[in-house]
């Protein structure tokens, strides 16, 4: 677990790149595959001689709180602006994310415990959003602005990053211009 700025992995701004095209993959590969796999392993080895070092588990928590959850609507719902070619897949509405990965983290560490517990409460519908922030994920050209009563984001691109993913096997052919400043 380390920063991999300019390469595949966690970027210094807590976004995630899965490929060298530098397209934002924080929600898909960075959350669903990378962070959750590390979180699961941290849970398996918590309290043993194999537990993650404080530095590494803290980086994982920071990645969840300052990267993944800040690119989600209130840390609860997927932000459509972060999705790539999979945005063309049909879905049945918007669902709250679960709490399993957070509960596992809290067994591994108490670092930033209050913030993690707030996300659990939000996801269970036991609290209302209180966090206000504006964050530009400069490695992936994604800007998020949140207040307790609203959330908005803008997806952009630059000369450093690809606009969108390549349209592999058809998905994504209609999404090329989404990063021309799409606002959600």
Task: Describe the residue ranges of each PLM region.
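Extended polysaccharide-engagement surfaces of secreted carbohydrate-active enzymes
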Residues: 41-184
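Active-site lining segments of carbohydrate-active enzymes
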Residues: 1-51
């Amino acid at each position: 677990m380390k920063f991999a700025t300019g390469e595949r992995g966690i970027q210094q701004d807590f976004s995630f790149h899965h490929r060298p095209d530098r397209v934002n993959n924080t929600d898909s590969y960075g959350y669903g595959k990378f962070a959750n796999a590390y979180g699961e392993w941290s849970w398996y080895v918590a309290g043993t001689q194999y537990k993650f070092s404080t530095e590494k588990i803290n980086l994982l928590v920071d990645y969840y709180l300052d990267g993944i959850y800040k690119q989600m609507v209130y840390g609860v719902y997927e932000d459509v602006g972060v999705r790539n070619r999979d945005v063309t897949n049909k879905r049945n509405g918007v669902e709250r994310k679960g709490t399993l990965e957070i509960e596992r983290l809290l067994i591994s560490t108490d670092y930033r415990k209050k913030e993690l517990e707030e996300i659990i409460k939000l996801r269970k519908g036991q609290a209302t959003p209180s966090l206000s922030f504006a964050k530009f994920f400069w490695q992936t050209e994604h800007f998020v602005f949140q207040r307790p009563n609203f959330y908005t984001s803008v997806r952009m691109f630059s000369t450093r990053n690809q606009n969108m993913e390549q349209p592999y096997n058809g998905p994504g052919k209609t999404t090329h211009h989404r990063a021309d400043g799409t606002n959600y």
